[in-house]
C-alpha cells in the first residue's frame, strides 16, 4: 500500500516503521487512509487501542454503540471492520445524522446530558458488546453516559471513553477542583 508519508506525523511514523523500513498498520488504520466513504475524525493512536480490544469481536454478531456520529465515517469503519454480522448503533444530538443510516447501521437522536434518553437507549438496544463514547466530551456527558449505560454492557464487553482530557477543561465543565472530577470518581 502506498502512503503519503507527509500525512503521517513523525511520532506516528516512528511508532509504525519496523527496522526493515516497512510501515505496519492494522485494518482500521488502512481503512482510515483508504476511506472511500464519509469523513472519519479519530486520533491516530486510538487505532492500535481499538484493534487490541475489539479484534476478538471480528466476524461475530457484535453490537457496537458509538456516541458521536459526526459525518458517519467511523460507523462505516466499524461496519467494515466487524463484518456482515455486526450491528452498529450511532447516537448523536444532531437530527441530520439520522440520514446516515444504512444496512447494519441504526442511528438514535438524543442528548447525552439527558439521563432518561440514555436509559431508554439502553432498553432499546438488545445487547451492547462495545460502547465507544466519542460524543460531546463534557465531563457531565461522560459521567452521565457511563453511569446510565455501563449496566447495559455485556459482562465481557468493552466500554471505551475517548478524549478524557476534556474533563480537565473548564469550557467543558471540567477542572481538577470540581467535585465530580474524574480523578475523584472511585
Where are each of the predicted segments found?
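A short alpha-helical cap/connector motif
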Residues: 1-132, 136-161, 165-186
Amino acid at each position: 500500500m502506498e502512503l503519503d508519508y507527509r500525512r503521517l506525523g513523525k511520532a506516528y511514523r516512528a511508532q509504525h516503521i519496523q527496522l526493515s523500513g516497512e510501515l505496519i498498520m492494522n485494518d482500521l488504520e488502512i481503512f482510515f487512509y483508504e476511506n472511500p466513504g464519509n469523513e472519519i475524525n479519530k486520533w491516530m493512536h486510538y487505532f492500535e487501542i481499538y484493534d487490541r480490544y475489539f479484534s476478538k469481536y471480528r466476524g461475530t454478531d457484535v453490537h457496537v454503540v458509538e456516541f458521536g456520529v459526526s459525518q458517519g465515517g467511523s460507523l462505516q469503519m466499524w461496519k467494515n471492520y466487524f463484518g456482515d454480522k455486526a450491528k452498529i448503533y450511532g447516537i448523536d444530538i444532531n437530527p441530520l445524522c439520522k440520514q446516515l443510516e444504512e444496512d447494519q447501521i441504526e442511528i438514535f437522536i438524543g442528548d447525552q446530558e439527558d439521563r432518561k434518553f440514555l436509559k431508554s437507549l439502553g432498553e432499546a438496544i438488545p445487547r451492547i458488546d462495545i460502547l465507544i463514547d466519542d460524543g460531546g466530551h463534557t465531563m457531565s456527558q461522560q459521567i452521565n453516559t457511563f453511569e446510565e449505560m455501563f449496566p447495559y454492557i455485556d459482562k465481557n464487553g468493552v466500554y471505551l471513553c475517548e478524549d478524557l482530557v476534556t474533563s480537565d477543561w473548564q469550557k467543558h465543565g471540567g477542572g481538577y477542583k470540581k467535585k465530580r472530577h474524574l480523578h475523584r470518581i472511585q
